[in-house]
């Protein structure tokens, strides 16, 4: 018998439930129904292979249950030793691949139940965990991966890691179930000062951005911290609240939202403001209607001024006025760049973040070889790419030799700038919410679009493309200049008009259409863009569509164009 998510949380004995009994049940590859909810807080989702679901049903077999495991890696920074260990885990327990998420975490796919605990223990042995990587808690904290700002990145990373640790659940359930920690008196009744016994109404996302780069898409986060840098010195952070991508097809009560900038805080105020924002959502969020439970709806339902006043009351101080800042783009810089500290950083484009050895790529082997050099560190970017960071000039030649040997820079040499910067969620065959393909379709769609780009001289023009298998928007499609949002197998909603800076939502342009219809809809728009764009100001595709009157801002009830780019 299943229960409501709120009941499952409150009766779980601080996220324990009957997980240990579910794991021990050898009769099925699945967990008990309520435990399928609880395991999310431990960093895993129960899934099945949808490609063979019908076949197994015909054979009177249960679905091919498997588990996705997601790491908690604030800012996506790991050492070469950790990389090698995670590579080994993927090879031994998962489907021989690693996947970089849009929130700078790793996902392992294809882990079966009887190996779930061993996999969790192996991950923790690397000094990485999976606690709170999923569930109605604060998720993995994003950090700008800007390799040019070496000192700023180090400071942002330290602040983000501090916030991540501060907002972890206090329960010992994770350590008891997966790491065999001895139970003590009071086990199952630990105090949760931030989350309480029902945790948050829905998931919560935090990002740290470093202008002029908005690679984290900070305005898609529930809570954003925008670094204010002057002469290389970090003064503090502008605070943004209320971003979120998820929506439901055909439901006018749901919509994506860009965040509001509400003020400025100093570094020593970070934890107080983060706690105030999270607990405000905990107490004001909608627990009766789950699809309306995200913080963006809390703000829209109660009013921005009311929520900001409550945050200030809980923090014990009013935020200072927001400081000037400006974003230039939300993509990655590919190739080598030298940081302020004289170390070098190589950004590699990895299509949809998938790292595997296939018929056409040897990314897993190649990055293993680079990790074995034991130089620098690895940084996952919010665009699902990878930075080999902190490389001394004397080691560049060795890295370059391996990059060439394994063709790791093939993505950097993609036929179009659009393909290099495109993102996609996993979707089929493992995501239970997917309505259409995304990751597996991205190469084909990019290739289908390529002739149009070449025809109009746009192959080298950066256009933000994102694919999502469903309207929940894990690939942040609603901020893209071109987005496909899955509606049914082979059919998508075509969304147009976001911008390169991650500051404007796009708009539904055509609904429930196939690839030929998508290409037919895009061709005249790309033709006009090529002929009429403002070259002098490097006008983006989304900006052109609005200037030319070819598309309007979305008509979401609370959406308005926010003046986010303050004069620096």
Swiss-Prot record:
Its EC number is 1.8.1.2. It holds the Pfam family NIR_SIR. It catalyses: hydrogen sulfide + 3 NADP(+) + 3 H2O = sulfite + 3 NADPH + 4 H(+). GO terms for biological process: cysteine biosynthetic process; hydrogen sulfide biosynthetic process; sulfate assimilation. Binds 1 siroheme per subunit. Binds 1 [4Fe-4S] cluster per subunit. Component of the sulfite reductase complex that catalyzes the 6-electron reduction of sulfite to sulfide. This is one of several activities required for the biosynthesis of L-cysteine from sulfate. This is Sulfite reductase [NADPH] hemoprotein beta-component. It comes from Xanthomonas oryzae pv. oryzae (strain KACC10331 / KXO85). The lineage of its organism: Bacteria, Pseudomonadati, Pseudomonadota, Gammaproteobacteria, Lysobacterales.
């Amino acid at each position: 018998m299943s229960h409501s998510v709120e009941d499952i949380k409150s009766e779980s004995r601080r996220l324990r439930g009957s997980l240990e009994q579910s794991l021990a049940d050898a009769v099925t590859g699945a967990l008990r129904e309520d435990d399928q909810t609880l395991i999310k807080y431990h960093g895993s989702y129960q899934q099945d292979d949808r490609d063979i679901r019908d076949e197994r049903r015909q054979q009177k077999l249960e679905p091919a249950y498997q588990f996705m495991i997601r790491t908690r890696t604030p800012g996506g920074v790991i050492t070469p030793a950790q990389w090698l260990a995670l590579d080994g885990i993927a090879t031994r327990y998962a489907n021989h691949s690693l996947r970089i998420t849009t929130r700078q975490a790793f996902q392992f796919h294809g882990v079966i139940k009887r190996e779930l605990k061993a996999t969790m223990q192996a991950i923790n042995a690397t000094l990485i965990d999976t606690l709170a990587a999923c569930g109605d808690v604060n998720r993995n904290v994003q950090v700008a991966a800007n390799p040019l700002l070496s000192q700023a990145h180090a400071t942002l990373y330290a602040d983000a890691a501090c916030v991540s640790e501060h907002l972890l659940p206090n329960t010992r359930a994770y350590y008891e179930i997966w790491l065999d920690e001895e139970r003590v008196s009071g086990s199952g009744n630990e105090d949760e000062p931030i989350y309480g016994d029902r945790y948050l109404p829905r998931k919560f996302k935090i990002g740290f951005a470093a202008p002029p780069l908005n690679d984290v898409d900070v305005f898609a986060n529930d809570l954003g911290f925008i670094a204010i840098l002057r002469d290389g010195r970090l003064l503090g952070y502008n605070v943004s609240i209320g971003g979120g991508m998820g929506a439901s097809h055909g439901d006018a009560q749901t919509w994506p939202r860009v965040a509001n900038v509400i003020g400025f805080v100093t570094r020593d105020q970070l934890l107080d403001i983060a706690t105030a924002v999270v607990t405000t959502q905990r107490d004001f969020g909608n627990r009766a209607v789950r699809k309306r439970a995200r913080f963006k709806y809390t703000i829209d339902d109660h009013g921005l001024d009311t929520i900001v006043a409550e945050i200030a009351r809980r923090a014990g101080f009013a935020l200072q006025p927001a400081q000037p800042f400006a974003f230039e783009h939300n993509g990655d810089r590919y190739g080598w760049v030298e940081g302020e500290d004289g170390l070098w950083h190589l950004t590699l484009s990895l299509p949809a973040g998938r790292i595997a050895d296939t018929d056409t790529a040897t990314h897993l082997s190649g990055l293993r070889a680079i990790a074995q050099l034991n130089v620098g560190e690895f940084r996952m970017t919010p665009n699902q790419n990878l930075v080999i960071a902190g490389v001394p000039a004397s080691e560049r030649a060795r890295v370059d030799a391996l990059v060439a040997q394994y063709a790791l820079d093939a993505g950097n040499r993609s036929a179009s700038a659009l393909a290099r910067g495109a993102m996609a969620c996993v979707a089929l065959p493992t995501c239970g919410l997917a309505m259409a393909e995304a990751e597996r379709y991205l190469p084909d769609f990019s290739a289908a679009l390529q002739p149009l780009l070449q025809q109009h001289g746009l192959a080298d023009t950066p256009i933000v493309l994102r694919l999502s298998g469903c309207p929940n928007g894990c690939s942040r499609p609603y901020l893209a200049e071109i987005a496909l949002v899955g509606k049914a197998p082979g059919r998508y909603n075509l969304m147009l008009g976001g911008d390169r800076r991650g500051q404007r939502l796009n708009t539904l342009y055509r609904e429930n259409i196939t690839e030929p219809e998508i290409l037919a809809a895009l061709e005249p728009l790309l033709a006009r863009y090529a002929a009429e764009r403002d070259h002098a100001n490097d006008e983006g595709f989304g900006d052109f569509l609005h200037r030319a009157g070819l598309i309007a801002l979305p008509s979401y009830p609370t959406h308005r164009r926010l003046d986010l780019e303050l004069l620096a």
